[in-house]
Design a protein with these regions (language model features):
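Catalytic and substrate-binding clefts that recognize carbohydrates or anionic sugar/phosphate headgroups
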Residues: 1-166, 176-177, 182, 189-194
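Aromatic-lined carbohydrate-binding/catalytic grooves of carbohydrate-active enzymes
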Residues: 60, 163-283
Length: 283
């Protein structure tokens, strides 16, 4: 009908928020920064008009509801140990593709920028939504089609398509932290079969490692790896041993020695190996 699918928003950003002095004091008492409650412009930024009937999907596994309208998100991979409620804007993965379902049309946008980026889908102001990034280029691919599956087709044309996985990977897989020994794994496997609950794979979390050192195995708690894996394989389970790639700082640990000798690890701006604390301690 000649109506444009997308319109750039040209009036600038304005936060629909009035905060009294009393509210500022409450926010500050709870640890919030009130120094800049206005709109923060990013070095890379683009704004679009937001229509009342627009619904948003995509972005990968983010918190909140399936429809992302009226929420804000960040593309900045983060390991959040707390409950994943809607207050958290980033999780483990960053997939910068957004799909919009309008009343009679659909469209999508792929933001090809690897820097820390932000999407505010009407939370700041119901009149617009915006994409911003700390740096990089504004490389935006517009995806069009008659239905949402058409957008997926166009998006994967750009990124490449994943081959069909093995059939067992599409079944239920059991995964949790806290299996302290091989007997815990055996107990879980037996209960699944005794209760006739379909399950195709059991994930071994970082408990199986020796002191959380990647590419090691704790023989004292888990026995020989081949024995346990063969045992649950007879019950119809595949085994997935997870990797948490924080390499423990330990001069006697082969991974640490090899990484330092070959310069495999991330460094800071001074060229010093970057160290932070994760599961094995300093890593």
């Amino acid at each position: 009908d000649g109506t444009p699918l997308v319109r750039t928003h040209r009036q600038g950003r304005s936060v629909c928020r009035e905060v009294s002095e009393q509210m500022k004091q409450i926010l500050e008492s709870e640890g919030h920064d009130t120094s800049n409650l206005g709109a923060h412009d990013y070095p890379v930024q683009m704004m679009f008009d937001l229509d009342e009937g627009d619904d948003f999907y995509g972005l990968g596994d983010k918190t909140g509801f399936l429809n992302k309208k009226n929420y804000e998100y960040e593309n900045w991979n983060s390991d959040i140990p707390q409950a994943h409620n809607e207050d958290y804007h980033a999780l483990y993965k960053s997939i910068p593709v957004l799909f919009c379902k309008k009343k009679n049309d659909v469209y999508g946008m792929f933001f090809d920028n690897t820097f820390h980026s932000y999407l505010n889908l009407g939370k700041e102001n119901p009149e617009y939504y915006f994409y911003g990034a700390d740096d990089g280029n504004l490389d935006l691919y517009f995806l069009g089609g008659e239905k949402l599956t058409d957008l997926i087709e166009e998006y994967t044309y750009l990124t490449g398509r994943t081959p069909l996985p093995q059939r067992w990977t599409l079944g239920y897989q059991q995964s949790r932290w806290g299996y302290q020994c091989a007997e815990d794994i055996r107990d879980v496997a037996e209960h699944f079969r005794d209760l006739d609950i379909p399950c195709d794979a059991i994930h071994f979390d970082i408990d199986y490692m020796d002191g959380y050192r990647v590419f090691t195995w704790n023989d004292a708690k888990y026995g020989k790896p081949g024995d346990l894996i063969a045992e649950i394989k007879k019950q119809g389970f595949k085994t997935v041993t997870i990797i948490d790639p924080g390499t423990k700082v330990d001069p006697d640990y082969f991974m640490c020695k090899e990484g330092e000798e070959n310069g495999y690890f991330a460094t800071d701006t001074q060229g010093t190996t970057y160290v932070n604390e994760v599961w094995p301690g300093d890593a």
